[in-house]
């Protein structure tokens, strides 16, 4: 089973663009979207040590939580199928069905039992876990826990090995904060980790992020910033400007991105670069993490 997690490091792709040259920026994309067709991106990283732990402790099922477009739900279902683990997904929104969108449909096809609950019920996750999966290995919403952060921290190790040095900046979208926190545990004062939240009012994530950093590293040596208001209206919401940017970015780079996670990160990263040195000084090296999430892109109906 461990062979599955022994992939070669995901590619580090250079972005050549006159826009970046104008500001003296070297931009690389860490292509975690290429790690696996279904268990891809940061979900591959976050599930790694959780799946290994579940198997080593002889669990036969996984239970987790998520929303209608949750990449974590889709990836957990796929991983469960790969490793012969039953999967249960508690889904926020009792108006939904297993065929409401491609994400839920694919999770169902991969054998996940979906349980739809009201938004009020969803807040009682501990009670739901006890009710529907007493003997299951429980993964939190988004898969974010200490084992997930451990897996995500390995992204920084790969970046440093591939570049031969620490970059000036590493950027990542933030939904539950696990990948961001993992990167921060391996950052140094010379590398600033930038997080772009994809949800409204995400400040509640900060205590858990800081606790994770304190568990694995030295908070005094952590250099990071989170942009709390760069979410384009909230989770799974878009703007015409965002969608137009995604079209241009894909045409110029050949890299497919989606509008819920990585698309927002790249959009706002380019906006920061375009501020003519107000944020990024010239001659900086930036590595942007592509966290995958393409599984539900083709037919998702997003809110403008």
Predicted region positions:
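PLP-dependent amino-acid enzyme catalytic core
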Residues: 1-304
